[in-house]
Amino acid sequence: MTTVGVSLFRRSPEKITMKIAAFLGLSFLLIASYVLICEAQHPGFQELLILEENMRDPENSKERSCAKPRENCNRMNILCCRGECVCPTFGDCFCYGD
């Protein structure tokens, strides 16, 4: 009777290895999905929205391809209407100045 109870709690090394491998595989998939979600929220999409907004803004009709103060900007693609594009250590770049 005692040997039956003890054998129920013993696990073979193959089962333990398979559980560890499954855990590591699922952890990798979870991290990969987080990376893909973050990539989907790339600032390039936000830059496109700024350009579309500026195209429809009558106040900004002379400077249609620029970002207003405190809007996000990118030194490569979108210039600021007035002021300069400031990029902090953490976070998105934004237009600063008048």
Curated annotation (Swiss-Prot):
The keyword Zinc does not apply. Disulfide bonds join 66-81, 73-85, 80-95. Expressed by the venom gland. Residues 41-64 form a propeptide. It comes from the Eukaryota. GO terms for molecular function: ion channel regulator activity; toxin activity. One of its GO terms (cellular component) is extracellular region. Its main location: secreted. Keywords: Disulfide bond, Ion channel impairing toxin, Knottin, Secreted, Signal, Toxin. Residues 1-40 form the signal peptide. It is found in: Secreted. Belongs to the hainantoxin family. 17 subfamily. The presence of a 'disulfide through disulfide knot' structurally defines this protein as a knottin. Putative ion channel inhibitor. This is Hainantoxin-XVII.2. The lineage of its organism: Eukaryota, Metazoa, Ecdysozoa, Arthropoda, Chelicerata.
